[in-house]
From Swiss-Prot:
The keyword Isomerase does not apply. Coiled coil: none annotated. The gene is sconC. Essential component of the SCF (SKP1-CUL1-F-box protein) E3 ubiquitin ligase complexes, which mediate the ubiquitination and subsequent proteasomal degradation of target proteins. Controls sulfur metabolite repression, probably by mediating the inactivation or degradation of the metR transcription factor. The keyword Cell wall biogenesis/degradation does not apply. InterPro entries: SKP1, SKP1-like, SKP1-like_dim_sf, SKP1/BTB/POZ_sf, Skp1_comp_dimer, Skp1_comp_POZ. Pfam families: Skp1 (PF01466), Skp1_POZ (PF03931). Component of the SCF (SKP1-CUL1-F-box protein) E3 ubiquitin ligase complexes. Keywords: Ubl conjugation pathway. PANTHER family: SKP1. Signal peptide: none annotated. This is E3 ubiquitin ligase complex SCF subunit sconC. Belongs to the SKP1 family. GO terms for biological process: protein ubiquitination; ubiquitin-dependent protein catabolic process.
Length: 164
């Protein structure tokens, strides 16, 4: 429920749990911000059908910490984001979760359109992969190798440039 006095809104997770938060925190999500603009101050809880309670609370924790950050403009320096996998200390600690939760946070950030959180999640995964062999990456993410030795050799030959 939205209240002009406290400026709070309620979100309903996929498992039916209602979470009340500040509107400013919720608006870190472009999806929620657009829904609020479209629906107005109806006072009705906003359903978040693709995100369960535990993930929603984790995303809200991140949004609360970053509520004072300037909003993403969409035309931020894309090149600088692509070139670095540096993550600030608070975000590194925040992302110290099990793999399932990490991937759920990434999916939720994508669904809720929280670009900065999506970037942090993807950089976390990139850092998990950095410097590892394909075998080590498979072990880290529990991925089964379904290539034949011949297919692996062909892929290595085609991608030799990446090994340099």
């Amino acid at each position: 429920m939205a209240s002009t006095a406290t400026n709070k809104i309620t979100l309903t997770s996929s498992d039916g749990v209602e979470v009340t938060i500040e509107r400013q925190v919720a608006e870190r999500s472009i999806l929620i911000k657009n829904m609020l603009e479209d629906l107005g101050d109806s006072g009705e809880p906003i359903p978040i059908p693709n995100v369960n309670e535990s993930v929603l609370k984790k995303v809200i924790e991140w949004c609360e910490h970053h509520k004072g950050d300037p909003p993403s403009t969409g035309d931020d320096d894309v090149d600088s984001r692509r070139k670095t996998t540096d993550i600030d200390e608070w975000d590194q600690k925040f992302m110290q979760v099990d793999q399932e939760m990490l991937f759920e946070i990434i999916l939720a950030a994508n669904y809720l359109d929280i670009k900065a959180l999506l970037d942090v999640g993807c950089k976390t995964v990139a850092n998990m992969i950095k410097g590892k062999s394909p075998e080590e990456i498979r072990k880290t993410f529990n991925i089964q190798n379904d290539f034949t030795p011949e297919e692996e050799d062909q892929i290595r030959r085609e991608n030799e440039w990446a090994e340099e």
